[in-house]
């Protein structure tokens, strides 16, 4: 039996000792979630009372996996840029290929990603589900669910004898974002950041939290409907006139291509390198399902 399974069984046994008390704190956790920011178009995320627990072993496995996969992704992206025959395998339309082939303006080929896997915790074996390198999300759901779980009786009892930690995904991403931005040409110390998406698809509450974290790091930051960006005289602006230095792109590539004619100012600014696009179109190479074949 793996340590992960043993800990899960221990957690379950604790919940059996006082069912009524655990039911009460489970309801309190659910009530917290219902009133939290972990919502998408009015719907709340759901979770089990017993969380998935991983140990240092899994953390090492996942860390090695990420390092290996990023190395593979970078080789694939490099081959795509250099080999026309290889590019044809991906089947991207010419307008998207043009955006992908732009010369990178910073050092990180894939600034952020979520690699989804089916994991066998007994053996450490896994199968890939998705390489999400385009519009990666769910950081806020993770944050809020961890807060909710920590309010439960079972978690508090387990925490008396075990040390738990969760991963901080907001300040860590903002700091990484700014590090990447500062590797681009002529960076400002504190850039003005636009978090852009098609707002009918956006996880707006998550964006608002990211904006607050950017502000805490000395930046101006706004949520912005990607269609409403304005490109004038070599500068990109938000509708209220904020000059945009860097974009945190949450608009997925498929939506951008679907609405290509509606986002002309955004596209023009990107092609002119008038703005630093964190989450550039080259990430679509790793995101494409052709890599499974």
Give names to the regions the model predicted.
Residues 1-293:
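Preference for protein termini
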């Amino acid at each position: 039996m793996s340590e992960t399974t043993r800990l899960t069984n221990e957690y379950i046994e604790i919940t059996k000792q006082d069912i009524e008390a655990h039911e009460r704190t489970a309801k309190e956790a659910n009530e917290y979630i219902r009133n939290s920011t972990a919502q998408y178009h009015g719907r709340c995320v759901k979770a089990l009372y017993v969380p998935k627990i991983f140990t240092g072993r899994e953390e090492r496995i996942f860390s090695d996996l990420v390092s290996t996969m990023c190395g593979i992704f970078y080789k694939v992206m490099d081959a795509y840029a250099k080999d026309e025959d290889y590019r044809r395998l991906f089947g991207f339309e010419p307008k998207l290929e043009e955006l992908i082939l732009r010369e990178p303006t910073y050092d990180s080929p894939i600034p952020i990603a979520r690699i989804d896997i089916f994991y066998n915790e007994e053996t450490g074996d896994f199968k890939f589900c998705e390489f999400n390198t385009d519009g990666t999300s769910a950081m806020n759901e993770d944050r809020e669910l961890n807060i909710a779980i920590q309010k439960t009786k079972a978690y508090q009892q387990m925490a008396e004898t075990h040390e738990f930690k969760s991963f901080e995904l907001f300040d860590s991403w903002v700091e990484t974002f700014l590090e990447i931005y500062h590797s681009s040409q002529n960076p400002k110390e504190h850039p003005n950041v636009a978090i852009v998406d098609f707002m009918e698809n956006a996880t707006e509450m998550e964006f608002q939290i990211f904006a607050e974290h950017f502000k805490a790091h000395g930046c101006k930051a706004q949520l912005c409907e990607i269609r409403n960006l304005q490109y004038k005289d070599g500068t990109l602006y938000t509708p209220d006139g904020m000059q945009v230095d860097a974009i945190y792109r949450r608009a997925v590539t498929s939506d951008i291509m679907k609405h290509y004619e509606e986002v002309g100012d955004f596209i023009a600014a990107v092609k002119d390198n008038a703005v630093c696009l964190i989450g550039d179109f080259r990430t679509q190479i790793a995101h494409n399902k052709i890599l499974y074949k």
